[in-house]
Amino acid sequence: MRVLIAEHDYHVYTQLLRKAAPDLEVFSTGDSAELSRMASDCPVWLGQPDLMANLLRQGHTPQWLQSTWAGITPLLADSLSRDYRLTRAVGIFGQVMAEFVLTYMLGHEREVLARLMSQVERKWDNRTG
């Protein structure tokens, strides 16, 4: 089976997929024109929705499209074909998102950016906390 990887970090995904499933034919590149040429020969696509949306706009359609993002918004444009199976990354970003939100909330509560600006401007900051 031929698998196209449309991802900015395509080399990492290619290496991991070839190691996990050596019987697959994996196609990947950082060049968008070459990616477009490869797309028509690959029934399975793995990658970023924004990059795969460009391939769909060019008239290519996979049998199965696996998003590496949880969100699929770029693939929902009215002009794009939806004649394929679409799956997305789910259940793997929970802890990372929780850490991001907690860090952001702490930074907001402690006014980290305002304190940084005061330091850059060499102003004494009398904020409590």
Where are these regions (language model features)?
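An N-terminal-biased, well-structured beta-alpha scaffold segment characteristic
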Residues: M1-L86
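Phosphate-binding beta-alpha-beta segment of Rossmann-like dinucleotide-binding domains, i.e.
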Residues: R82-G129
